[in-house]
Amino acid sequence: MLSYRHSFHAGNHADVLKHTVQSLIIEALKEKDKPFLYLDTHAGAGRYQLSGEHAERTGEYLEGIARIWQQDDLPAELEPYIGVVNHFNRNGQLRYYPGSPLIARQLLREQDSLQLTELHPSDFPLLRSEFQKDNRARVDKADGYQQLKAKLPPASRRGLVLIDPPYEIKTDYQAVVTGINEGYKRFATGTYALWYPVVLRAQIKRMIKELEATGIRKILQIELAVRPDSDQRGMTASGMIVINPPWKLEAQMNNVLPWLHKTLVPAGTGHATVSWIVPE
């Protein structure tokens, strides 16, 4: 079942949170000269046209990236991420949104590498064309969860693994935990960043319980809600679960998350939290 297209949702509040966390982790990994791997299990198309039919139909980016990218009081923690957004929108008009692979491409160094996976028959060719001239990148049409077995550990023993499936089938909530556990067995020192949507809170609670049961330590949870939890249809919040986070990440997110919540949610509904699921 491959009906999900991220082009309908690109640049929304969930992308803002996900890509803020992603960019801060990458910047932390760059503090050492040694190369690292960026592995993206569900990479999508790479870039998204915000004036395109899909993005215009939902308008989700108007309540996401459009609310923050030109703010005068932008916190320092957002500079790497917004710098990439600006790179793709140099005329001051918000026309394109870079997905996680393009954010990684802009922030990674020459010595680093990218392993990108996408299974959707429409998105894969778009992703491949974005990276055909980048010799740091390998783009595969494959099952992202299988890559956690096949591509880990990297030779450098350093890396960020981003896992953000569409959750269009309920088994994704279990598959992400199984995938992380398989990856962790092979690469216990890597940083794993798992994105999740809050549609039904009970699903997230179950997923976190299963993650705790793996015995993995150092699990940080970052969540941004735009509305209170609800049993109605639709995403009320999203979060990032980070295993082996860089030591600065907790403080960085505690600093920037209140600003993001205030700017993205003028009505003040929902919440913004940073907490440990499992400490060291």
Say what each PLM segment does.
Residues 1-280:
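Class I S-adenosyl-L-methionine-dependent methyltransferase catalytic core
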